Amino acid sequence: MASLLYFILFLLFVCISYYFTYYPTNKLQAAVMETDRENAIIIQRNDEIPTRTLDTAIFTDASTVASAQIYLYYNSNIGKIIMSLNGKKHTFNLYDDNDIRTLLPILLLSK
């Protein structure tokens, strides 16, 4: 009878040890795990090809205008716009004036 009690207590100890090892047991761990999940989702979205399609005019040089179809993705967390044109990804930082000057004509001339 005593050995059965020891066995049950041992199983209870194993279950409690498993719980404390693999599950968050305080608010900090829970917050960190939630932030890691959100960051993984953002990273996955940034790696995907954007789905918004625009027909726009691209200035290849000062006198030449070419029609093109671009794909846009906007990441509000880091303030970047990712543009895919002819299979190439271009990243524009919304906090950089040169990138904004490059991006505005593309967006204004798009349908």
UniProtKB/Swiss-Prot annotation:
It is a single-pass membrane protein. It is found in: Virion membrane. The keyword NAD does not apply. Pfam families: Chordopox_G3. Residues 22-111 are virion surface. Keywords: Fusion of virus membrane with host cell membrane, Fusion of virus membrane with host membrane, Late protein, Membrane, Signal-anchor, Transmembrane, Transmembrane helix, Viral envelope protein, Viral penetration into host cytoplasm, Virion, Virus entry into host cell. Unglycosylated because produced in viral factories instead of the classic ER -Golgi route. GO terms for cellular component: membrane; viral envelope; virion membrane. It comes from the Viruses. Induction: Expressed in the late phase of the viral replicative cycle. InterPro entries: Poxvirus_G3 (IPR010367). One of its GO terms (biological process) is fusion of virus membrane with host plasma membrane. The chain crosses the membrane at residues 1-21. Interacts with OPG099/L5. Component of the entry fusion complex (EFC) composed of OPG053, OPG076, OPG086, OPG094, OPG095, OPG099, OPG107, OPG143, OPG104, OPG147 and OPG155. Except for OPG095 and OPG053, each of the EFC proteins is required for assembly or stability of the complex. Belongs to the orthopoxvirus OPG086 family. Component of the entry fusion complex (EFC), which consists of 11 proteins. During cell infection, this complex mediates entry of the virion core into the host cytoplasm by a two-step mechanism consisting of lipid mixing of the viral and cellular membranes and subsequent pore formation. This is Entry-fusion complex protein OPG086. It comes from Variola virus (isolate Human/India/Ind3/1967) (VARV).
